[in-house]
């Protein structure tokens, strides 16, 4: 099983210098929810990912980790 994080929210937040508290305020979410997302304990819904991308001014693809094997499987 692959133990790589499923999302890159923490990375993008660090690049934008946005804290969990700040992102939570932007999205109207509890900081505990943001913490679960950035630690990959749980994953945001697609709707939440879209909101996160808007708040962080990035593409939704910047927030999602896909390795080459996943991409190749999806091309079949």
What are these regions (language model features)?
Residues 9, 23-24, 34-37, 63:
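Conserved hydrophobic/aromatic packing and binding residues within compact polymer-binding modules
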Residues 28-44:
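Recognition helix of helix-turn-helix/homeodomain-like DNA-binding domains
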